[in-house]
Structure formats: structure tokens, C-alpha cells
Amino acid sequence: MLHLHILSWVLAIILFIATYLNISKNQGGTPYFKPLHMVLRLFMLLTLISGFWILIQSFMNGGANHMLLTLKMLCGVAVVGLMEVSIAKRKRHEQSHTMFWITIALIIITMVLGVILPLGPISKLFGIG
């Protein structure tokens, strides 16, 4: 399940950037915008479902840092929401650069939290998790 989660958020980030850049400031969405946006939503849903499943498994196993897990879950949900908001703002021709960079910053924070959690590579490297 962890590999599915990692694959889905990597593809979601790539699709988010592609979708965001496929909206022209003057003309609106390109012909590729709608399919990209639909596939992005699919991968965001897959990311949320797999992340929630990993959260449930970690809570059931015990010994995990529940505070960090819950914080990462909240950051993940916020990232999905901010992705949708920044794309919607750009589509409506509103100022969206600030929202885009806030989304990128929150993606980085969420990734750092995922790296230091018990199933992350840092914990595996040092045998913590």
C-alpha cells in the first residue's frame, strides 16, 4: 500500500503542475486541461484513500507517533484542497500565484513529514521504525 501511495502522490504532483500550466491567462483552459484535471482528481482521490489506509494500519499496529501521523494526514488533505483552489482561481482568471506557491510549500512540508515517519526512509535507514 505504501508504494501505491507514493506513486499516486508523485503522479498527482506532476499532474497538478501540468494542469496548472495548461490554463492560459487570456483564453482559459487548453484542450488538454479537462482530461488532465480529471486524471489529477483521480490520483488525488487515490492518494487520500491509500494515505488513510496507511494511517489506519499505523494506528492498529501501535508504537507509531500518532501526533505526526495525524499532522501529516491534515497536511495531505490541505494539499488536495489547495490544489483544487489554485486551479479554480487560475481558471477564473484571478490572482493564483500565491496560492500555487503556498501549495508547493505545503507539499514539501507534507513530504518531509512522510520521510521522518516510521514508514519513511529515514526511519528505515536508522532502524527507528
UniProtKB/Swiss-Prot annotation:
- Record-annotated membrane-spanning stretches: 1-21, 36-56, 67-87, 99-119
Q: Where in the cell is it found?
A: Cell membrane
Recite the UniProt keywords alphabetically: Cell membrane, Membrane, Transmembrane, Transmembrane helix
Q: Which GO terms describe its cellular component?
A: plasma membrane
Question: What single Pfam family name could you report for this chain, choosing any that match?
Answer: DUF1516
Query: Membrane topology per the record?
Result: Multi-pass membrane protein
Q: Which family does it belong to?
A: Belongs to the UPF0344 family.
Tell me the protein's name. UPF0344 protein SAR0931
